[in-house]
Amino acid sequence: AAAAAVSGAKRSLRAELKQRLRAISAEERLRCQRLLTQKVIAHRQYQKSQRISIFLSMPDEIETEEIIKDIFQQGKVCFIPRYRLQSNHMDMVKLASADEISSLPKTSWNIHQPSESDTREEALATGGLDLIFMPGLGFDRNGNRLGRGRGYYDTYLQRCLQQQGAKPYTIALAFREQICPQVPVDDTDVSVDEVLYVDAA
């Protein structure tokens, strides 16, 4: 019964957050994006990380393009998610350059990602990750995260623990509209180390 209550609470919170995200103006999106990019670039954890995984944004997520460009400018190694649709399996595969993104095929969710037949270095096979930037629909101040319900990141972080013996540092990028008093969680949900967002103008 408890599990059903949690999944019901997650469902209704997801619907509410999607609505809140749709209401954010284009100007506000740009403002948050710029300020968050600056916050990330100045962040100690980012500066000391060499192998970084970052998501390519969906329309209702913080745009990560400028951060990706900076990762390459700083000579760091960039990995992006390759989701296996119809499953909860995801790999973090190496990106050769920021310019390469636009030439990658698009998934049914309209996100660029390398195809399954495109052989690329997977982060965990070549030394793990120092830092993972996490997408999500909602977060609370304790780092609890509400994803889109597929479990890709929770499953991947478990793999990191098994294969590199430690969880990479995790930072969520969010609009303040995504910060909730409390996110409903269960045992499989992995919390994030830090949620970065921008306060009201």
Curated annotation (Swiss-Prot):
Gene Ontology CC terms, in alphabetical order: mitochondrion
EC number: 6.3.3.2
Gene3D superfamilies, sorted: NagB/RpiA/CoA transferase-like
Class in the EC hierarchy, top level: ligase
Coiled coil: none
N-acetylalanine sites (modified residues): A1
Subcellular location: Cytoplasm
Positions contributing to substrate binding: L56, E61, R148, G149, R150, G151, Y152
Database matches in Pfam families: 5-FTHF_cyc-lig
GO BP annotations, alphabetical order: folic acid-containing compound biosynthetic process; tetrahydrofolate interconversion; tetrahydrofolate metabolic process
Primary residence: cytoplasm
Catalyzed reactions: (6S)-5-formyl-5,6,7,8-tetrahydrofolate + ATP = (6R)-5,10-methenyltetrahydrofolate + ADP + phosphate
UniProt-recorded Gene Ontology molecular function terms: 5-formyltetrahydrofolate cyclo-ligase activity; ATP binding; folic acid binding; metal ion binding
Cofactor requirements of the protein: Mg(2+)
Residues reported in the UniProt entry to bind Mg(2+): D154, D189
Keywords: Acetylation, ATP-binding, Cytoplasm, Folate-binding, Ligase, Magnesium, Metal-binding, Nucleotide-binding
SUPFAM superfamilies: NagB/RpiA/CoA transferase-like
Residues the record lists as binding ATP: K10, R11, S12, L13, R14, R145, L146, G147, R148, G149, R150, G151, Y152, Y153
Entries under NCBIfam families matching the protein: MTHFS_bact
Subunit text: Monomer.
Family as reported in the entry's similarity comment: Belongs to the 5-formyltetrahydrofolate cyclo-ligase family.
Protein name, entry field: 5-formyltetrahydrofolate cyclo-ligase
Gene that encodes it: MTHFS
